[in-house]
């Protein structure tokens, strides 16, 4: 029997995952999480995070934090701020919100100091190994050309998943590796686990689905 897998749903800035619809989807995720054997977390916009973190029992992540502390940083949102509003942690360096190496290290370190979870996104094997060296909780490898494509990385580029897991573990045995890009079905999810990943980071496969509840239920094997 395999151990619990990890499913983190990134709401991005999709209309279907913002405001009232974000809260509705968060409650769907909470309901599905209560009925399956997988860990289900969600990454939501800064504006939705305080409300959703209060309203659901599953873990809620920020999609990004700025690599700054408190001070003269107009328009920035740092790790301390999301902690105060109930976030479990944050994505770091998503392909749509890339950071410099020093900023990734700053965020991972500060999130750890606050007792928050860091999910560092990478795009290939070398960057996965480099990210693992920073000692985040998770590294999520997502080839950018497959993001939102509906073509799962676990099928299109299985060697990227396998080699990323191997490279990360050689650097840091405790880091957990997720894979993303194009994940939409239970078959995609199971394949990712078979390749050595401990779970998936996905977005459009659930958020933009015509029936979000059914899409998530199918992904985690409830259908």
Swiss-Prot record:
Belongs to the triosephosphate isomerase family. GO terms for biological process: gluconeogenesis; glyceraldehyde-3-phosphate biosynthetic process; glycerol catabolic process; glycolytic process. One of its GO terms (molecular function) is triose-phosphate isomerase activity. The keyword Cytoplasm applies. It catalyses: D-glyceraldehyde 3-phosphate = dihydroxyacetone phosphate. It comes from Archaeoglobus fulgidus (strain ATCC 49558 / DSM 4304 / JCM 9628 / NBRC 100126 / VC-16). NCBIfam families: PRK04302.1, tim. Keywords: Cytoplasm, Gluconeogenesis, Glycolysis, Isomerase. SUPFAM superfamilies: Triosephosphate isomerase (TIM). Involved in the gluconeogenesis. Catalyzes stereospecifically the conversion of dihydroxyacetone phosphate (DHAP) to D-glyceraldehyde-3-phosphate (G3P). The gene is tpiA. This is Triosephosphate isomerase. Substrate binds at residues 10-12, 147, 182, 203-204. It is an enzyme of class 5 (isomerase).
């Amino acid at each position: 029997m395999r151990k619990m897998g990890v499913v983190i749903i990134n709401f991005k800035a999709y209309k279907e995952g913002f405001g009232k619809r974000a809260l509705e989807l968060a409650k769907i995720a909470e309901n599905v999480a209560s009925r399956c054997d997988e860990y289900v977390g969600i990454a939501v916009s800064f504006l939705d995070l305080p409300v959703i973190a209060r309203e659901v029992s599953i873990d809620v992540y920020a999609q990004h934090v700025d690599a700054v502390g408190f001070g003269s940083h107009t328009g920035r949102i740092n790790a301390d701020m999301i902690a105060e509003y109930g976030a479990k942690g944050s994505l770091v360096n998503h392909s749509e919100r890339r950071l410099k190496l020093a900023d990734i290290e700053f965020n991972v370190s500060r999130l750890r100091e606050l007792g928050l979870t860091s999910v560092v996104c990478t795009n290939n094997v070398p960057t996965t190994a480099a990210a693992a060296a920073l000692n985040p909780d998770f590294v999520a490898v997502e080839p950018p050309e497959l993001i939102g494509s509906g073509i799962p990385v676990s099928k299109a580029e299985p060697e990227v998943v396998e080699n990323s897991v191997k490279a990360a573990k050689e650097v840091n045995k405790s880091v957990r590796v997720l894979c993303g890009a194009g994940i939409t079905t239970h078959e995609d999810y199971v394949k990712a686990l078979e390749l050595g990943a401990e779970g998936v980071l996905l977005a459009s496969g659930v958020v933009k689905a015509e029936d979000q509840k059914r899409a998530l239920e199918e992904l985690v094997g409830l259908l």
